[in-house]
C-alpha cells in the first residue's frame, strides 16, 4: 500500500500465532510484494461516504486498479487476481483490458470478489429464519452494485420465503453497503466484514489451487460466449 503505516500493520499482524509469514511493503512500486505471487487481492482505493454510490468512486479507483494490474502483468502474470476495489463491476473490466493489452489475460484467473454479498445474505437469512449462520449458504450471482446483486433465495436448502420476504431481503442485501456507510456517518464503508469476506475468498482460492475438490465460491467473472 502507499500508506506509510503498512509495514507497521504487517508487524501487528505478524504477532498473531499462525503458520503464515507476513511481510508489509509500502510505496508506489508494488514489485517486491508481487514477485512470485500466486494470488493477488486488490482492495486499494477510496471508500464511499454518505450520499455516494459505488459508481462515484470510479474516477479515483479506476486509476489505482489500472496501475496495480499493470504491475501484476509485468511481475506476476500467472497470478490469480481478486478485485475488491469498488466499483467492482467496472474495475474488473478495467483489469481485464489491461491484462489483454499486456497479452497475459486469462478469464479463469480474474475475479470480482463479491463474497461480502454472500456473507451478508447468510447473516440476514439466518436472523430472519432463526437459524445459525453456519447452517445457511446463499448463492449470490451478478455484480456488486445495486440491482446487479442477485441473491438466489430459492436455492437455500430447507428454507422457504413469502413473496414479501423475498422482496424485503433482496432489497436489504442490495443496499447493505449503504446501510454501513450511513451508520458510519462519514467514517468510511464496510471494512471488518469486507476483511472477513476477502479472507474467505482468498482461502477458498488457495484451497482449490492446492487440489481440494468441491470448493465453490460465487464471483463476478467473464462468462462463456
Swiss-Prot record:
Annotated positions binding NAD(+): 1, 61, 84-86, 194
Reactions the enzyme catalyzes: (S)-malate + NAD(+) = oxaloacetate + NADH + H(+)
Any single Pfam family the record assigns to this protein: Ldh_1_C
Gene Ontology terms: cellular component: cytoplasm
InterPro entries for this protein: Lactate/malate_DH_C (IPR022383), Lactate/malate_DH_N (IPR001236), Lactate_DH/Glyco_Ohase_4_C (IPR015955), Malate_DH_AS (IPR001252), Malate_DH_type1 (IPR010097), NAD(P)-bd_dom_sf (IPR036291)
Molecular functions per Gene Ontology: L-malate dehydrogenase (NAD+) activity
Any GO BP: tricarboxylic acid cycle
Keyword terms: NAD, Oxidoreductase, Tricarboxylic acid cycle
EC number(s) stated in the UniProt entry for this protein: 1.1.1.37
Binding site for substrate: 48, 54, 86, 120
Source taxon at top rank: Bacteria
Catalytic residues as annotated in Swiss-Prot or TrEMBL: 144 (proton acceptor)
Function according to Swiss-Prot or TrEMBL: Catalyzes the reversible oxidation of malate to oxaloacetate.
Similarity annotation: Belongs to the LDH/MDH superfamily. MDH type 1 family.
NCBIfam families, A to Z: MDH_euk_gproteo (TIGR01772)
Subunit structure: Homodimer.
Protein name: Malate dehydrogenase
Gene name of the encoded protein: mdh
Amino acid at each position: 500500500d502507499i500508506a506509510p503505516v503498512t509495514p507497521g500493520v504487517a508487524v501487528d499482524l505478524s504477532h498473531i500465532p499462525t503458520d503464515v509469514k507476513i511481510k508489509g511493503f509500502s510505496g508506489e512500486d508494488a514489485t517486491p510484494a508481487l514477485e512470485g505471487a500466486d494470488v493477488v487481492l486488490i482492495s486499494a482505493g477510496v471508500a464511499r461516504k454518505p450520499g455516494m454510490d459505488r459508481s462515484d468512486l470510479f474516477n479515483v479507483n479506476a486509476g489505482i486498479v489500472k496501475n496495480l494490474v499493470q504491475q501484476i502483468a509485468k511481475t506476476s502474470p500467472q497470478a490469480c487476481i481478486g478485485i475488491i476495489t469498488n466499483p467492482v463491476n467496472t474495475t474488473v473490466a478495467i483489469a481485464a483490458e489491461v491484462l489483454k493489452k499486456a497479452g497475459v489475460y486469462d478469464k479463469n484467473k480474474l475475479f470480482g470478489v463479491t463474497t461480502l454479498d454472500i456473507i451478508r445474505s447468510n447473516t440476514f437469512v439466518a436472523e430472519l429464519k432463526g437459524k445459525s449462520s453456519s447452517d445457511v449458504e446463499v448463492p449470490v450471482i451478478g455484480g456488486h452494485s445495486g440491482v446487479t446483486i442477485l441473491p438466489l433465495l430459492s436455492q437455500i436448502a430447507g428454507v422457504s420465503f413469502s413473496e414479501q420476504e423475498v422482496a424485503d431481503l433482496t432489497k436489504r442485501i442490495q443496499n447493505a453497503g449503504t446501510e454501513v456507510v450511513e451508520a458510519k456517518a462519514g467514517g468510511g464503508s464496510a471494512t471488518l466484514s469486507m476483511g472477513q469476506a476477502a479472507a474467505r475468498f482468498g482461502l477458498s482460492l488457495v484451497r482449490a489451487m492446492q487440489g481440494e475438490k468441491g470448493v465453490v465460491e460465487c464471483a463476478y467473472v467473464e462468462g462463456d460466449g
